[in-house]
């Protein structure tokens, strides 16, 4: 797979910006987590099957891996969601890279985050407009570092643009049971 890689240096970390032609991600090797991902919903009605697909580790980038997700409450949270790119198997497989995966609380990933992802696809269908999304992974306050070295995000900010309307949502990295995705709109 071809990647365009731009190296960024900051005071506290080493990060890479990677554009794989489907989404763009800034990835922190220090946190072993993405810092942000940008994408445009491509296939809101795609039917490609995820069956048999698993996350893969890209070459030359220190990422999280399966060990970070064992025996805990964190899912491999797609930031550029697989369902928005299920045009075909090849496109879908690009979303299964660990550069596109964050340690996301299972209650968030399977709850209101998933419902907001469905809204993105529904909006692309209903309005017939491009739906552009930026997901920012938050590392604020006291952070948890797993024994494997990966840092657990404190939350996620999702910025959705449909035409000339932009809305921002901020989710803590915790269970969202008993809430609605609209509750997380950033006012």
Language-model features: locations:
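Domain-level detector of nuclease and nuclease-like folds
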Residues: 59-187
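Short, His- and charge-rich active-site/binding loops that engage polyanionic ligands
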Residues: 16-75
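Sec-dependent N-terminal signal peptides
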Residues: 2-13
């Amino acid at each position: 797979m071809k990647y365009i890689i731009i190296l960024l240096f900051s005071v506290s970390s080493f990060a890479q910006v990677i554009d794989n032609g489907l989404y763009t991600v800034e990835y922190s090797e220090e946190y072993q987590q993405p810092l942000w991902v940008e994408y445009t919903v491509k296939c809101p009605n795609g039917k490609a099957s995820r069956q048999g697909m698993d996350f893969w580790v890209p070459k030359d980038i220190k990422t999280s891996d399966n060990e970070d997700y064992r025996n805990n409450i964190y899912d491999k949270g797609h930031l550029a969601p697989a369902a928005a790119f299920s045009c075909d198997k090849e496109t879908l497989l690009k979303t299964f890279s660990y550069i596109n995966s964050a340690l996301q609380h299972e209650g968030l990933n399977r709850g209101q985050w998933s419902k907001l992802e469905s809204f993105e696809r529904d909006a692309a269908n209903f309005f017939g407009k491009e739906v552009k999304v930026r997901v920012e992974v938050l590392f604020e306050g006291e952070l948890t570092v797993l024994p494997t070295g990966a840092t657990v995000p404190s939350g996620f900010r999702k910025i959705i643009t449909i035409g000339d309307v932009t809305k921002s949502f901020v989710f803590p990295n915790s269970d969202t049971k008993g809430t609605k995705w609209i509750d997380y709109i950033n006012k």
